[in-house]
From Swiss-Prot:
Keywords: Ribonucleoprotein, Ribosomal protein. It comes from Azoarcus sp. (strain BH72). Residues 1-26 are annotated as: Disordered. This is Large ribosomal subunit protein bL35. Pfam families: Ribosomal_L35p. Belongs to the bacterial ribosomal protein bL35 family. One of its GO terms (molecular function) is structural constituent of ribosome. Residues 1-16 have a biased composition (Basic residues). GO terms for cellular component: cytosolic large ribosomal subunit. The lineage of its organism: Bacteria, Pseudomonadati, Pseudomonadota, Betaproteobacteria, Rhodocyclales. GO terms for biological process: translation.
Amino acid sequence: MPKMKTKSSAKKRFKVRSSGGIKRSQAFKRHILTKKTTKSKRQLRGMTEVHASDEKLIRAMLPYA
């Protein structure tokens, strides 16, 4: 049986933690930042946990993670 391929889009967007959870970066932080407040931009920093309902789909895209 051939090797399973990892989805490149998922590889770039998600990181699997040692505890088994999946991290993702926040949306709405790329452009059109002038109308967003400093507080809202600060709260978009860093990574957040993927929702449990999406986790199964992401794990299928990352077979070796």
